[in-house]
Amino acid sequence: MEQVVLLNDSGQAIGVTDKATVHHLDTPLHLAFSCYVFNGRGQLLLTQRAHEKRTWPGVWTNTCCGHPAPQEAMPEAITRRLGEELGLTVRDLTLVLPRFRYRAVMGNGVVENEICPVFAAFTDDEPAPNREEVAGTAWADWSGFSAEVLAGTTDISPWCRQQVAELVELGANPAEWPAADPADLPDAAVIAAG
């Protein structure tokens, strides 16, 4: 059974719970990650969440999101999920937003509540989606996509919308985004990365 790391407001681990039971009307704060994968042309790989997902089914979002297992290093968790969901290998995995946090509520009241460090990476692969996780994929020009997200003219997951607003502040070219200091990760992630 897949487990997620529960957090306090300071980002310290306070326990674990089964992933299958964590998302509900009063979802506890937990540790996650988001990854934005680009190709050599600077295009972002977008994914459509599988229609069977408990949270935001069928919604388009960034390349990959997930939860590190207890004591699992963030890079290993990201590499694992990219392989499981999309059959991708990546290079230059870079921490870019170490303390991103959000809370979002679906129309049915189910809550997502995460401290979710954001990473960027690059690939030469084409995705081979696992249909249990990903309903569709598309490559999108970063500048056009980010402009549409900021203008509110494209439907995208709530976390992706908030992340894009912060990512554009890092610069126009994702290949030149500065690496964040891993010491700025929440304590639970630093412990997991040890």
Curated annotation (Swiss-Prot):
The keyword Transmembrane helix does not apply. Mn(2+) binds at residues 23, 30, 67, 112, 114. Pathway: Isoprenoid biosynthesis; dimethylallyl diphosphate biosynthesis; dimethylallyl diphosphate from isopentenyl diphosphate: step 1/1. It is found in: Cytoplasm. Its EC number is 5.3.3.2. It comes from the Bacteria. GO terms for cellular component: cytoplasm. Mg(2+) binds at residue 85. It catalyses: isopentenyl diphosphate = dimethylallyl diphosphate. Binds 1 Mg(2+) ion per subunit. The magnesium ion binds only when substrate is bound. Binds 1 Mn(2+) ion per subunit. SUPFAM superfamilies: Nudix. Gene3D superfamilies: Nucleoside Triphosphate Pyrophosphohydrolase (3.90.79.10). Keywords: Cytoplasm, Isomerase, Isoprene biosynthesis, Magnesium, Manganese, Metal-binding. GO terms for molecular function: isopentenyl-diphosphate delta-isomerase activity; metal ion binding. The active site is at 65, 114. GO terms for biological process: dimethylallyl diphosphate biosynthetic process; isoprenoid biosynthetic process. Its cofactor is Mg(2+); Mn(2+). CDD domains: NUDIX_IPP_Isomerase. The keyword Magnesium applies. Belongs to the IPP isomerase type 1 family. Catalyzes the 1,3-allylic rearrangement of the homoallylic substrate isopentenyl (IPP) to its highly electrophilic allylic isomer, dimethylallyl diphosphate (DMAPP). NCBIfam families: IPP_isom_1 (TIGR02150), PRK03759.1 (NF002995). HAMAP family: Idi. This is Isopentenyl-diphosphate Delta-isomerase. It comes from Saccharopolyspora erythraea (strain ATCC 11635 / DSM 40517 / JCM 4748 / NBRC 13426 / NCIMB 8594 / NRRL 2338). The lineage of its organism: Bacteria, Bacillati, Actinomycetota, Actinomycetes, Pseudonocardiales.
